[in-house]
Amino acid sequence: MAAGAAAALAFLNQESRARAGGVGGLRVPAPVTMDSFFFGCELSGHTRSFTFKVEEEDDTEHVLALNMLCLTEGATDECNVVEVVARDHDNQEIAVPVANLRLSCQPMLSVDDFQLQPPVTFRLKSGSGPVRITGRHQIVCINNDLSEEESDDESEEDEIKLCGILPAKKHRGRP
């Protein structure tokens, strides 16, 4: 009877962990940490381009999420075309105009979390600016290391053996 109760308890423990994603071939997702920092640069007649680069690190992904491009103090009423130079899905360099700003009709443009993978270069293709580009630099780190506690839990689970279900004994002489 005690062996049956222990087996049932082990089974329930294993099932509750499986529902949480930790047993039976299912893995708990690796812990993810995310940091977010303000980003800003200014393009003008003196500084016509800016390149956003990051150092390559293991298990770290960088995302530049643009929020707004706007003309700042000192801008004249001319067309200011800003283009982004980045890599496409084939890893080929591609230049795409993202904003055409003019002081009298469209002095700013909200791009609502437009995400880019570094390295990214911003160029003032035409006009003299100054154009301010703002956004967020997001750093996502995935930690694939298992803690000692998780490793111990896995070794305990390997040791647990479930007893097979035996048919009930029938008593003769009882209806």
From Swiss-Prot:
Phosphorylated. The keyword Phosphoprotein applies. It holds the Pfam family Nucleoplasmin. The modification Omega-N-methylarginine is found at residue 27. Plays a role in the regulation of diverse cellular processes such as ribosome biogenesis, chromatin remodeling or protein chaperoning. Modulates the histone chaperone function and the RNA-binding activity of nucleolar phosphoprotein B23/NPM. Efficiently mediates chromatin remodeling when included in a pentamer containing NPM3 and NPM. GO terms for cellular component: actin cytoskeleton; cytosol; nucleolus. SUPFAM superfamilies: Nucleoplasmin-like core domain (SSF69203). Interacts with NPM (via N-terminus). Forms a pentamer with NPM at a ratio 4:1 (NPM3/NPM). Two pentamers form a decamer. This is Nucleoplasmin-3. One of its GO terms (biological process) is rRNA processing. It comes from the Eukaryota. Predominantly expressed in testis. Keywords: Acetylation, Chaperone, Methylation, Nucleus, Phosphoprotein. The modification Phosphoserine is found at residues 16, 147, 151. Belongs to the nucleoplasmin family. The modification N-acetylalanine is found at residue 2. It is found in: Nucleus; Nucleus, Nucleolus. The lineage of its organism: Eukaryota, Metazoa, Chordata, Craniata, Vertebrata.
